[in-house]
């Protein structure tokens, strides 16, 4: 529940609004029972316990990188389904990457998360739990959130928007919108809706190819919203929000790494203030795809920068603990 919804629920019980704030604060400190909320009267705690339950995911598996301390969680949800989240440590703070769905309907060829398709969309509380319990279990204060785990966040638009409202609340975890990144494979209608909300988060668009022919081969979504249609929506988003878009670009040998594609990408992103985040392909056996060579990646980056487009190579974290999103869930469920 949002704080406003919780206040309405307490008003219906004849309780003052400040009681809702107390419960909201308890929940965001990780309370897993109403009995633990000691600043509430016992009768109120009993009433709440009879009307509601507090959900808590359990750790099905946890991996800690020996290389950099990255922590990968596989959470078992109330219905037995599993999702992943990853805690990454940086000099500027700790970031958690969370999932938005169980499985994914988008079918991107290079991604393990989409194998098996969509099972269901996560509730706002299940999104929040990944942040909260990753923080509590790891002991690391979370300052940044990226919605780049399993699932397509904009396919779960309403629940993700409710989650953002809750996690941004000053009475809860109070994580600022500018510390939140949301990734999409390019659902144009939802990008347009997101622009109208002007949330000041960072939008990351999984582009992965600048031309329709190669992008359609690896990303089925391109058949509905081709590259130029997607980039037009991105330009409108930038104009309305003033927020620079980060374009995710997986470097795939023979698919998306040619000098000609680098030139085309630079041309199509001109004037957008865009940033390209180049990502070496993580191995997904079923895809039959391979990452680009270091030489090809350096050449691609140089061409972008020579044409006025900023580009960085994503730092690889947790490479020894199933770094590819969706891999841990697949291995766990296949055993």
Question: At which residue positions do the language-model features occur?
Answer:
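Auxiliary Fe-S-binding modules of radical SAM enzymes
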Residues: 1-81, 235-244, 249-335
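Conserved alpha-helical substructure of the radical SAM core
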Residues: 114-144
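Conserved AdoMet/S-adenosylmethionine-binding subsite of the radical SAM
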Residues: 135-312
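A short loop-to-beta-strand scaffold at the N-terminal edge of the catalytic core in hydrolase folds
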Residues: 82-87
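Canonical Radical SAM [4Fe-4S] cluster-binding loop centered on the CxxxCxxC motif
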Residues: 89-126
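A generic beta-sheet turn/junction motif
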Residues: 66, 78, 89-91, 186, ...
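Short linear Ser/Thr-Pro motifs
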Residues: 65, 99-100, 113, 183, ...
């Amino acid at each position: 529940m949002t704080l406003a919804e919780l206040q309405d629920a307490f008003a219906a019980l004849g309780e003052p609004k400040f009681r809702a704030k107390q419960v909201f604060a308890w929940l965001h400190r990780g309370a897993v029972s109403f009995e633990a909320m000691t600043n509430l009267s016992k009768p109120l705690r009993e009433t709440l316990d009879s009307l509601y339950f507090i959900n808590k995911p359990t750790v099905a598996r946890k991996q800690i990188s020996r290389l950099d301390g990255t922590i990968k969680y596989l959470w078992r949800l109330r219905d037995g389904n599993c999702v992943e989240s990853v805690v990454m440590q940086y000099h500027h703070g700790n970031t958690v990457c969370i999932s938005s769905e169980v499985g994914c309907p988008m079918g991107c060829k290079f991604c393990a998360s989409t194998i098996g398709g969509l099972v269901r969309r996560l509730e706002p509380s299940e999104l929040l739990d990944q942040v909260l319990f990753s923080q509590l279990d790891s002991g690391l204060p979370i300052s940044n959130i990226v919605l780049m785990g399993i699932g397509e966040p904009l396919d779960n638009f309403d629940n993700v928007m409710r989650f953002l409202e809750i996690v941004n609340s000053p009475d809860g975890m109070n994580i600022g919108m500018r510390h939140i990144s949301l990734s999409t494979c390019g659902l144009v209608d939802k990008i347009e809706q997101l622009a109208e909300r002007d949330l000041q988060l960072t939008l990351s668009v999984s582009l992965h190819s600048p031309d329709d022919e190669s992008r359609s081969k690896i990303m089925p979504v391109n058949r509905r919203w081709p590259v130029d249609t997607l980039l037009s929506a991105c330009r409108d988003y930038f104009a309305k929000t003033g927020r620079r878009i980060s374009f995710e670009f997986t470097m795939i040998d023979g698919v998306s790494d040619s000098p000609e594609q680098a030139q085309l990408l630079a041309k199509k992103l001109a004037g957008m203030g865009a940033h390209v985040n180049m990502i070496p392909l993580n191995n997904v056996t079923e895809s039959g795809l391979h990452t680009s060579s270091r030489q090809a990646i350096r050449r691609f980056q140089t061409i972008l920068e020579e044409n006025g487009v900023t580009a960085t190579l994503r730092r690889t974290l947790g490479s020894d603990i199933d770094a590819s999103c969706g891999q841990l869930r697949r291995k766990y469920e296949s055993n």
